[in-house]
Design a protein with these regions (language model features):
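Structured beta-strand/loop patches that form or line metal/cofactor-binding pockets in enzymes
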Residues: 1-44, 329
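Conserved, mostly hydrophobic/aromatic
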Residues: 3, 41, 98, 111, ...
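Metal- or metallocofactor-binding catalytic centers and their adjacent structured scaffolds
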Residues: 37-110
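Hydrophobic faces of well-ordered beta-strands that scaffold small-molecule active sites
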Residues: 44, 128-130, 163-167, 192-196, ...
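Predominant activation on well-ordered alpha-helical scaffold segments within soluble catalytic domains
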Residues: 55-62, 95, 99, 103-104, ...
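Shared catalytic-loop signature of beta/alpha-barrel
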Residues: 56, 210, 216, 225-242, ...
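Metal-dependent enolase-superfamily TIM-barrel catalytic cores that perform enediolate-based chemistry
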Residues: 119-236
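C-terminal extensions of enzymes
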Residues: 330-375
């Protein structure tokens, strides 16, 4: 079986509500979608972060896949090992799009689910985290935000069955602390997290962390910039620290462990360059006694299915993962169903999802008119 063609599409899909963080507010997601075709008729689908800049890299890398077997992924990764050096996150994202498409094709060719190809299931359902941002209380005065967001979060967790909640933090450290206190008061039993995306200084991270110790947070994610800063915070705060910003490649792992900077590392198939690297990260975390979770970059159904397969086959990934999937107003696959705050791991061949090509074309046309929504 040889790859004969690679199709690349860039799509814009709306969110149900605006989503805000310490560095952006967005109303939709732009994603790059890939299809590989083979001489046997088997096809594989992939999806990755961002839009046209990543799609341009994907098209360059795709030239190296033509004539190769989808099973020859190790050779493909070795050939592209310098791509992240030149393109950073964009390079990892581009490699991952093709990587996932090849895994999907391998599963379809063998009649096996991606979970089975990765070692078999260790869980059949994956719990998601309810993501809370200040945009969930539009027009509310700052003084009233804690109460408004607590009411919103209580409603979301009750209706959706979520057992974990993450607040997207901002540069308003005191305001974030006040919101978290109110969230804990109405949700005493959920796993509670906060992620300022490194918007806080080291001193502010220490002060906020000490103030938050009484709330029994599951972890504090990327309060400040860098491994050195995180290590200073961890030395003074009795809350586990998590990162998806200072350990973003394997070269970062050793210094983070040596300096005692983190307790939990967020992996991501699309930020780490594919499925095998994400599984390798899990092995690193288990070896050094660290926790692991999965980051969300706005995955649609194809990318979500890949994350579910990784979680479904990886014992260390036992926490409720971050996922924006339930926040999208539509999808380009037959939708995955959220039940009791969880998604079931697909069991069909490959990714186990079916792409709606009419919707794919529609949302590609939206991108052609509007340009990229997320960069």
């Amino acid at each position: 079986m040889k790859i004969t063609d690679v199709d690349v599409h860039v799509v814009n899909l709306p969110l149900l509500n605006p989503f805000t963080s310490s560095f952006e507010t967005k109303t939709g997601e732009t994603r790059t979608v890939v299809r590989i075709r083979t001489d046997t008729g088997v096809e594989g689908w992939g999806e990755t972060m961002w839009g046209r800049p990543v799609a341009a890299i994907v098209k360059i890398l795709a030239e190296d896949l033509i004539g190769m077997s989808p099973f020859a992924l190790e050779a493909f990764h070795r050939k592209q090992h310098m791509v992240p050096f030149f393109y950073g996150y964009l390079g990892y994202a581009a490699i991952a799009a093709l990587d996932v498409a090849c895994w999907d094709a391998m599963g379809k060719a063998t009649g096996q689910s991606l979970t089975d190809l990765l070692g078999g299931p260790v869980r059949e359902e994956v719990p998601l985290t309810a993501l809370v941002t200040r945009a969930d209380a539009p027009g509310v005065r700052p003084a009233d935000l804690p109460t408004a967001l607590a009411e919103h979060t209580l409603r979301v967790t009750t209706e959706g069955g979520f057992q974990a909640v993450k607040l997207k933090g901002t540069k308003d450290v005191r305001g974030d602390v006040a919101i978290l206190r109110e969230l804990r008061s109405v949700l005493p039993d959920v796993s509670l997290r906060v992620d300022p995306n490194a918007a806080w200084s080291v001193p502010d991270s220490v002060r906020a962390g000490i103030a938050l110790e009484e709330l029994d947070l599951e972890y504090l994610e990327d309060p400040c910039v860098g491994i050195e800063g995180m290590s200073q915070v961890r030395a003074k705060v009795r809350i586990p620290l998590c990162t998806n910003m200072c350990v973003v490649r394997f070269e970062d792992f050793a210094p983070a462990v040596r300096l005692g900077a983190v307790d939990v590392i967020h992996g991501d198939v699309y930020k780490w360059g594919g499925i095998a690297p994400t599984k390798a990260l899990a092995a690193h975390c288990e070896t050094f006694g660290l926790g692991m979770n999965l980051h969300s970059g706005g995955e649609l159904g194809i990318a979500t299915a890949a994350h579910l397969a990784v979680v479904g086959s990886t014992p260390v990934l036992s926490r409720a993962i971050d996922s924006m999937y339930y926040l999208h107003a539509d999808d380009i696959i037959e939708p995955l169903t959220l039940e009791n705050g969880s998604l079931r791991v697909p069991t069909g061949p490959g990714l186990g999802v079916t792409v709606d090509e009419d919707k794919l074309r529609h949302y590609a046309e939206v991108n052609a008119r509007e340009g990229d929504l997320t960069r």
